[in-house]
């Protein structure tokens, strides 16, 4: 009987040992970081109902799937991050494009320098907005290319420089990497006031999406590169946010490339915006207003002056409704425009995930 008791005790101790080993392995597996721990998946889907009166007097309305955006961010290593973003926009082509894809090598919490390579919109301009429609500065100057960027940060100061081979090139020259830009930004928070601002330079503003479209067939045969500069800033306090931006070509284009009133154009775009958020019937509601303008930007299809207002209501987490009204004024007849005004009213449903 004693032998049976000893045998049972031995088997019990063996079982307990195996259980402890299994528990230890489970704890180790739980503690070991998984690749999926560093993966973030998200995006947005927007449906818009619009009514537009063009400068020609034509009145149109439509319901569109305005935008679908899907992104995957990963952090496979503490010194490596990646970002891939797909985009569908209602531009008449019904296509899905690779909007952004880049890798960032660095960890600014431990070392101030970093390297970024891939395709994305370069650091030329600040385009944050609480309106539904992008500011005119973005329509004129956003530049999305495959590039290599080197940056440095220190106490809220960010300095970046980048190189790329754009869609535009000089007449008679080979297709090569000869376009570049630089930006300097500063941001922080003090006494409940958050602020951010920056300046940017680009040696060929013609490579922005808006100006490349305006150049048309001349995009690969321009006479010379026209550099551009921009400045932007925003400040937030007590639920109020103020924003502003100014962007300009530093020289005039040739009249045969981008013209204004019979001469070479020197396009300018600017915007001012104010937004205030407060609870309305228990829902966070943002009221925004903007005034924007351009100079010598008729060839880009931009208005001379724009006034607008928008209201965005966060219905539930990740879902909002925005109502926006924009009033645009065209360039005068003597400048090549119609001298007329137009408007666009938009109701947007946006779901983020």
Predicted regions and their residues:
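N-terminal periplasmic/intermembrane-space "pro-region" immediately following the signal or transit peptide
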Residues: 1-46
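Compositionally biased, intrinsically disordered low-complexity segments enriched
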Residues: 3-6, 77, 294
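Outer membrane beta-barrel
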Residues: 30-168, 174-181, 185-201, 235, ...
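Outer-membrane beta-barrel pore domains
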Residues: 53-59, 101-108, 191-353
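Active-site environment of divalent metal-dependent phosphoester hydrolases
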Residues: 168-169, 207
């Amino acid at each position: 009987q004693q032998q049976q008791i000893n045998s049972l005790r031995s088997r019990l101790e063996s079982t307990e040992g195996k259980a402890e080993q299994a528990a230890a392995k489970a704890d180790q597996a739980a503690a070991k970081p998984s690749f999926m721990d560093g993966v973030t998946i998200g995006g947005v889907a927007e449906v818009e109902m619009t009514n537009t009166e063009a400068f020609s007097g034509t009145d149109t309305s439509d319901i569109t799937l305005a935008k679908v955006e899907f992104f995957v961010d990963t952090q496979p290593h503490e010194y490596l991050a990646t970002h891939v973003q797909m985009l569908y926009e209602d531009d008449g082509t019904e296509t899905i494009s690779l909007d952004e894809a880049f890798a960032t090598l660095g960890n600014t919490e431990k070392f101030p320098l970093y390297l970024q390579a891939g395709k994305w919109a370069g650091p030329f301009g600040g385009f944050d907005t609480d309106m539904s429609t992008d500011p005119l500065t973005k329509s004129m100057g956003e530049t999305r290319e495959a590039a290599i960027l080197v940056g440095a940060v220190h106490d809220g100061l960010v300095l970046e420089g980048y190189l790329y081979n754009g869609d535009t090139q000089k007449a008679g020259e080979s297709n090569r990497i000869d376009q570049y830009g630089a930006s300097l930004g500063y941001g922080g928070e003090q006494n409940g006031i958050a602020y951010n601002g920056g300046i940017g330079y680009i040696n060929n503003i013609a490579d922005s999406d808006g100006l490349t479209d305006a150049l048309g067939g001349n995009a690969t045969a321009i006479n010379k590169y026209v550099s551009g500069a921009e400045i932007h800033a925003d400040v937030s306090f007590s639920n109020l946010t103020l924003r502003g931006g100014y962007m300009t070509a530093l020289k005039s284009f040739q009249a045969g490339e981008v013209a204004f009133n019979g001469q070479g154009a020197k396009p300018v775009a600017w915007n001012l915006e104010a937004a205030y958020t407060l609870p309305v019937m228990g829902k966070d509601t943002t009221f925004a207003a903007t005034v924007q303008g351009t100079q010598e930007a008729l060839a880009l299809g931009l208005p001379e002056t724009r006034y607008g207002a928008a209201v965005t209501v966060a219905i539930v987490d990740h879902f909002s409704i925005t109502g926006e009204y924009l009033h645009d004024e065209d360039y005068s007849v003597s400048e090549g425009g119609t001298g007329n005004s137009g408007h666009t009213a938009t109701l947007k449903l946006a779901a983020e995930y």
